[in-house]
């Protein structure tokens, strides 16, 4: 727990080489006056390698003989890893654009494909007997270590997505705006369950009020628009290579035979779910935006509500069992988003001042079944349960500190531990006259009530200087170290 170990002895013990190449090409064909066909290809390739050296670390400890303790196994070691990842996307889009009278229309149809592949291989060895590996980057290769101590690991996956989409934008008189979209996505992540495909929709509308005749005489108002939208989105991402088909792990062993012996074994890394499917988000928002004083002042406000259904999440294992993955429930997030910005130009000088604020109220609507909870955290302090914020802190409410033995005698009996003056005084939440595990309750929420930001900028000709500040408030932090047990 000595932070100076990391600062003094572990600094500069890793060497990395990272390379990345990305690019895109496209071809466009305009035909029949109102049609356009566009094909786009993009690729992103990354290659990352690292070598990490483990030194022998000794620290002072007055509680042991000689006052010196060697951390770890007392041996130097080297770890090497190599990772490559490729991402390839292709888009095929056909667009129709036309205007007649006071109407304008843009319609798009097409398809997209996305492919992602990752491979990683790593290995580690410690020093040979009596042969310390030098703290020299030129020597940080696993071939210098003892082959008998070799360990290795690997990680790999392939994933692809195919989508078909359509979108329509309609404008009447330059003031009434409508849009609608549809897409059908298929993901290889759910190919094992047969739930690869899912449909998603969205609609939206806007009214540019400032273009109406009854607002033309308001000289200080440059633009005023009311807007609203509703739509559905999908999520297939989980921290698993193949969410519907678990990989095998060799982190387990078993005892067989007479006489018994320990044999290495393989086990599913998590329980498969034959019904696993897309996570879906249904969202709507309504708001307004406006420009004032020759477009120098911009103000925008939106109320939003998002409901996540068929939530993709992992259920922790219990009593040595492996975890499970499933579509566990639904979550609601709602709040407001506000933004204001002032921008002006004075000769060669320009400046801008802006601020934004977002509020959020989070609640779990349902979770597997009534009364079910997901427990996580170093000390099982994070709970997720229907009717509460996601990941809320669960524990005992503190009413104060015991001052005297007399106060302890008059207080509800603490059955958790023997208390003395100076100990924390817990609240008897259920009122049964005792402090028990049944008195645990919600004591905090890790999700901030509000996030905010401030932007300052100044420019002179081709020179710019900007400052961005951000923060959050209304959330609690659970300190898992140096706390009451």
Predicted region positions:
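Extracellular/periplasmic, surface-exposed regions of secreted and cell-surface proteins
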Residues: 1-54, 65-388, 471
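Exposed, low-structure sequence patches enriched in small/polar residues
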Residues: 40, 110, 167-169, 226, ...
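Extracytoplasmic gating/loop element in the C-terminal half of outer-membrane beta-barrel translocons
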Residues: 60-62, 187, 415-421, 472-485
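C-terminal beta-signal and adjacent terminal beta-strands/loops
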Residues: 219, 361-363, 391, 403, ...
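Conserved active-site-proximal loop/helix segments of enzymes involved in bacterial cell-wall
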Residues: 312-317, 365, 435, 479, ...
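Glycine-centered loop/turn motifs
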Residues: 379-391, 414-424
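Acidic carboxylate motifs that coordinate Ca2+ or other divalent cations, activating on Asp/Glu
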Residues: 432
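Conserved SET/PR-domain catalytic core that frames the SAM/AdoMet-binding pocket
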Residues: 438, 448-462
